[in-house]
Curated annotation (Swiss-Prot):
Residues 83-93, 191-196, 218-223 are annotated as: DNA-binding. InterPro entries: Beta-trefoil_DNA-bd_dom, BTD_sf, CLS_fam, Ig-like_fold, Ig_E-set, p53-like_TF_DNA-bd_sf, RBP-J/Cbf11/Cbf12_DNA-bd, RBP-J/Cbf11_DNA-bd_sf. Keywords: Acetylation, Activator, Cytoplasm, DNA-binding, Notch signaling pathway, Nucleus, Repeat, Repressor, Transcription, Transcription regulation. Residues 381-471 form the IPT/TIG domain. The keyword Acetylation applies. The gene is Rbpj. This is Recombining binding protein suppressor of hairless.
């Protein structure tokens, strides 16, 4: 008899009044209120309704932030594809988009608002989600008492002719203070899962090694029976409430079992050995061979690329026909039966048939460094890469990403850098001299690593996962004002020397903080 996994607690969200929101939310809900009606924490307008000038971030405030790190983070988890609904049918997105509020900043913000006179309800974050189409009603998310919520009834109809769309999450506090509008990554609209033998010509429907997928099981095609592979409390289980995003890694066929393993590039094909690793916990399942499912059989000889929303089975390698299977909320091993008439097939039950789909994540992090602000914190800039340009005494850093605006400045640690906005995807700044971080230093004596951060002109801090490292030089660099001249010129040109060395051959590195996932393999009970 299979032994069970810990059962995840079920929560029944309280019924909430339906609210229709189709237009954009106002930027400042406290405008037009009297002094008595205005929330105590809300910045008041100046004379004749003029807003007070924004507070620029101070160096002391940045130091406090770097020490405390009280960030507020909005995570939007969703599938990369969505199946279109035809006529009156509603094919709800599966897995359902999920919004998480992460970071200690949410609790601190709530406590601060309540200290300033807000009630518990007024300090509660509220959220609505939609598909970015004003014709369709946005749905309210229930975030009361927890840090996540799923949108289980979103769909896109055939009257919507878009081939791609983005989810839109509108957030505000219970007292109507605006937080902003957060967008998901791009989602591709498909008509239905491809039943033809897939080819790599449709690469956007194939699944690459090292990307994230969700797996769900639906008994007898009943929506209410849908369960998702998920990790909770150090155990794999089949959850009806939450879904997990798992890295799917392609392995060599002769790769042995272990916590460390070598992965391959390329697209996942049926018949190949894969490893599923939870993107949150690092928990991993044993080595698996992914097999195509046809009705209630696993095909042993299929070798075509795995495609979005395909049904597949996972054979536990080096076992006697054991497959990854669910039994209610438990994850177990199920022993398949050979097909007497077809040697290339094995009979499995419904619980061993999993639907696979690629997933994505949009992540937005912010912190009100100088206290509450009037404007929404969105759009939240996202830095994707750094490129060091120039050499010698002119060290300039180019930032590439999304949602850049002219009112942003680049900070290196607690030092603000001279910044030039180029476009929504590119910014340029002068790298501060090492003396700004180490008083008395004229050149770099030992490696110094500082975080790279973006700051809005009203004190909102947007952290990145990027750092900048000063590495030792043999002597001082001569001072030159050329960098300032480059910034003052309204030109998108950058110095032609784009290597990562200066004229003396010394390295100054822009780097991403990457964390390697160490997986711990879980045992699947039989």
């Amino acid at each position: 008899m299979p032994s069970g996994f810990p059962q995840s607690p079920r929560t029944s969200p309280r019924a909430r009044p339906k609210t229709r929101i189709t237009g954009a939310l106002p930027m400042d809900y406290s405008e037009g209120l009297s002094a008595e009606e205005r929330p105590a924490h809300a910045p008041s307008a100046g004379k004749f309704g003029e807003r007070p000038p924004p507070k620029r971030l101070t160096r002391e405030a940045m130091r406090n932030y770097l020490k405390e790190r009280g960030d507020q983070t909005v995570l939007i988890l969703h599938a990369k594809v969505a199946q279109k609904s035809y006529g009156n049918e509603k094919r709800f997105f599966c897995p359902p988009p999920c919004v998480y509020l992460m970071g200690s900043g949410w609790k601190k913000k709530k406590e601060q608002m309540e200290r300033d006179g807000c009630s518990e309800q007024e300090s509660q974050p509220c959220a609505f989600i939609g598909i970015g189409n004003s014709d369709q009603e946005m749905q309210q998310l229930n975030l009361e008492g927890k840090n996540y919520c799923t949108a289980k009834t979103l769909y896109i109809s055939d009257s919507d002719k878009r081939k791609h769309f983005m989810l839109s999450v509108k957030m505000f506090y219970g007292n109507s203070d605006d937080i902003g509008v957060f967008l998901s990554k791009r989602i591709k609209v498909i008509s239905k899962p491809s039943k033809k033998k897939q080819s790599l010509k449709n690469a956007d429907l194939c699944i690459a090694s090292g990307t994230k997928v969700a797996l769900f099981n639906r008994l007898r095609s009943q929506t209410v029976s849908t369960r998702y592979l998920h990790v909770e409390g150090g155990n794999f289980h089949a959850s009806s409430q939450q879904w997990g995003a798992f890295y799917i890694h392609l392995l060599d066929d002769d790769e042995s079992e272990g916590e460390e393993f070598t992965v391959r590039d390329g697209y996942i094909h049926y018949g190949q050995t894969v490893k599923l690793v939870c993107s949150v916990t690092g928990m991993a399942l044993p080595r698996l061979i992914i097999r195509k499912v046809d009705k209630q059989t696993a095909l042993l000889d299929a070798d075509d690329p795995v495609s979005q929303l395909h049904k597949c089975a996972f054979y536990l390698k080096d076992t006697e026909r054991m497959y990854l299977c669910l039994s209610q909320e438990r994850i177990i091993q199920f022993q398949a039966t050979p097909c007497p008439k077809e040697q290339n097939k094995e009979m499995i039950n419904d619980g061993a048939s999993w639907t696979i789909i690629s997933t994505d994540k949009a992540e937005y992090t912010f912190y009100e460094g100088m206290g509450p602000v009037l404007a929404p914190v969105t759009p939240v800039p996202v830095v994707e890469s750094l490129q060091l340009n120039g050499g010698g005494d002119v060290a300039m850093l180019e930032l590439t990403g999304q949602n850049f605006t002219p009112n942003l400045r680049v900070w290196f640690g607690d030092v603000e850098a001279e910044t030039m906005y180029r476009c929504g995807e590119s910014m340029l700044c002068v790298v501060p001299d090492i003396s700004a971080f180490r008083e008395g230093w004229r050149w770099v004596r030992q490696p110094v690593q500082v975080p790279v951060t973006l700051v809005r002109n009203d004190g909102v801090i947007y952290s990145t996962s990027l750092t900048f490292t000063y590495t030792p030089e043999p002597g001082p660099r001569p001072h030159c004002s050329a960098a300032g001249a480059i910034l003052r010129a309204n030109s998108s040109q950058v110095p032609s020397n784009e290597s990562n060395t200066n004229s003396e051959g010394n390295y100054t590195n822009a780097s991403t903080n990457s964390t390697s996932v160490t997986s711990s393999t879980a045992t699947v009970v039989s």
